[in-house]
Amino acid sequence: MDQLTLTNPVFVTYTIAASIMVLKVMLQGWITVVRMMSNSAGFVSPEDSKAGPANPKPRPGQLDLNDDVDRSRRIHRNDLENIPAFLAIGLLFVLINPPLVAAQWLLYGFVAARLLHTLAYSTAQR
């Protein structure tokens, strides 16, 4: 298991890529909440539309779909479908001791693809 040490540049590459992806998943959930609060719409649960500190002025329709909120929610779901598999497969990839350049291309390539996917999807690109 010498591959799973910070002296292994392939493992360092993996830890950087994995850290960015975990932060992205965590941040996307909060982005959805911010969009929900700023639009005062797109709430999921009936209790979300009741008066309270997070919803001082309830109004009809807060439980209706809101494209801005729902788009962010779909990005988050897509992250939750793809990033855990990347974390597992990436770690297995480190264990086979691949060439550093190949690891950098594949691992950082995945990170770039996920970030570009988020940008394209959040701005409704096709």
What kind of feature is each model-predicted range?
Residues 1-16, 90-105:
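Helix-coil boundary and interhelical linker segments in multi-pass alpha-helical membrane proteins
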Residues 8-55:
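N-terminal signal-anchor transmembrane alpha helix
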Residues 17-20, 73-76, 106-109:
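Physicochemical signature of membrane-embedded alpha-helices that form the seven-helix bundle of GPCRs
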Residues 28, 33, 96-97, 101, ...:
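Membrane-embedded alpha-helical bundles that constitute the cytochrome b-like, heme-associated redox core
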Residues 52-79:
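Short membrane-interface loop/juxtamembrane segments of multi-pass integral membrane proteins
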Residues 74-77, 122-126:
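Interhelical loop and helix-boundary elements at the membrane-water interface
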Residues 108-124:
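Transmembrane alpha-helical segments of integral membrane proteins
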